[in-house]
Swiss-Prot record:
Family, per entry: Belongs to the DEAD box helicase family. DDX18/HAS1 subfamily.
Record-annotated Helicase C-terminal domain positions: 372-528
Region described as Disordered: 40-104
Function per UniProt: ATP-dependent RNA helicase required for mitochondrial splicing of group I and II introns. Also required for efficient mitochondrial translation.
Recorded catalytic activity of this chain's protein: ATP + H2O = ADP + phosphate + H(+)
Organism encoding this protein: Eremothecium gossypii (strain ATCC 10895 / CBS 109.51 / FGSC 9923 / NRRL Y-1056)
Name by which UniProt lists this protein: ATP-dependent RNA helicase MSS116, mitochondrial
Domain comment quoted from the record: The Q motif is unique to and characteristic of the DEAD box family of RNA helicases and controls ATP binding and hydrolysis.
InterPro entries hit by this protein: DEAD/DEAH_box_helicase_dom (IPR011545), DEAD_box_RNA_helicase (IPR050079), Helicase_ATP-bd (IPR014001), Helicase_C-like (IPR001650), P-loop_NTPase (IPR027417)
Biased composition range(s): Basic and acidic residues: 40-79
Amino acid sequence: MFRVTGIATARAVALQPFRAPLGVIRRFGISATASYEFQHGHDMQSRNGSRWDSRRQGDRRSSRWEGRGSDREDGERGSRGGMWRKPQGRRGRTDGAAREGFSLGPNTEVVRVADEAAGVESTPRTLVEEGVLSNELYEMLQSRGFDKLTPVQQKTLKPILQTEHDVVARAKTGTGKTLAFLMPLFQRLLEGPPSENVKAVVIAPTRDLAAQIFNEINEMRNANRKLRRFNAVVMMGGSSRTETFRSLERRRPNIVVATPGRLIDMLEACGPKYFTEVDFKVLDEADTLLEIGFKQALEQINDILNQLNQKGTTHIRTLLVSATLDDKVQSLANSIMNHAKCLFIDTVDPNEQATNENIAQKVVISKDFADNITASLYKIREEASANPKLKAIVFMPTIVAVEYWGELLQSQCRGTPVLLFHGGLSQGRRNSTMKRFRAMDSGILVCTDVAARGMDVSDVQHVYQVGVPTSPDNYIHRIGRTGRAGRKGSSTIFLAEHELCILDILRRKNNVVISDQETFDAAAQELSDVREAFSLDRDRLHDFLLKNLSFYRGSQGEYDFPLEAYISIARAYGTLLGDSNQRLTLSGRMLTTFVPNHPAVCSLFNIIGPVNSKSSYGFRDTNKRHRRGRLDDSGRLEYSKKRHSYARSYSPSISDGF
């Protein structure tokens, strides 16, 4: 057995509801999660079409600049029209489990597993010799070329297999955590009597991740003939409900991988027939499940499975795996854990930065938005030209950005395949795109955050991010698409000066310091062909910039952008067209959907129709003084060094604290 240390004291966690639903949701009365599923390919349907009003909860700050929704997806906040409120700033959520000790309610004792006792030096062979792992699983690992276990697998396998407690594990992405929770499921199936009922349920936040876990299960089964008798089925929205019933009846699976909505659908329809013998429920990417808004659905799944179980309502073990463990994850764990004792396994050193140490990180800093979007296209084109074997992923904030910028990259990188991937695609199209990208020796995938978590493409060399991610946490998950399974990888984020606040957030919250910093000087580069590409389709450029403005509005609560951010995007239209007199056009009624109603910003747009007088920036400014700065003679904003030191003219150096 292993040694345990540090029994945590229980404490209650108070939650506050999320306050910024999409304007579309309010207009049509659709719940936040149902609308999210409808737009972005996540599974929130129930059998009778009921709506799961699983509002996001926790201490994440809602957007204070409220405007109607955009095409943002996968963890991005929407907003509604209304009065601006003073931004409260982004202090960031603390990772309570890592810094204060993971704790649950008064009925559950949390036991922290010591690293050295969890089997840090374990190998597949030693686990077989100790009777922890079966020969079948050992042969499966050998046939797949896995002679060693990853650190995450070494720390988690023995605690899971040698106890009957619930388990919460914190692990970085790309560290082999999927295999770490699948091997115990197969081990228990090998040890138990034959059964035609479901013995384990694995819940994933997205269809793509569910499909990936299902494929991993099939690879394990195909690697050893004795494992093939344990069938598995994947159930997710977007697929035929009738076909799901047929698969359950025909295959009689022992393992079910599902997204929450479709799982509830099947439990309501045929739970007593197939789900009465469940021993395990696994929540993969638990933080993502909560960010999307699945908390109530997960609690309902837990209640149904407990009620159906023949061995009692407290029989099912819970394995919860997450890259981050904030108060929201602790609250979820507290509501779905069945056993009196929960093991907490933290595979991340609290003094270690949250990103994978195998990933070389870099930031390219540009003066403004126009230079930043130009720098990203220019730099990635040059890298693809210099490295014909480049295999990379480029993350953009919105669907429109993926389609517009991605097609520009396709026109610039003639010899490199460029694929587009986002939540607006059908599930079949998404599956075929990922299958094609995995099979490529070289190529570039341009995508939204739908691919940021859990998606495994083992040979990605470089991850690029254009602008700030939808949340600072997503920076960690995005770059986790490279440097997987012990390989080396590279990451580059392109930022305008007004976006540098994210570097400070990453440093304070995640202990991530990007020391490799480069300033992009547009004047020193030959960019005529790149700038010409932006001017070929003015309408699409116009739409692209408006969607970026809307994204900024929705992310205001995360980053507390200065007014200069909106001014920079507004001026980008004329800059990219090569004509400073060109302006973006906005309806007065929709003005505050995209920008704060401030003279310094509004003067840069062609505004059609009257501006809604009730929608204001929050003050009347007759002296042209801004709440956090003032306008200089040229109309640019000057900022207080105390509050917005990152908004100054930036010269990159480590001494700046980034």
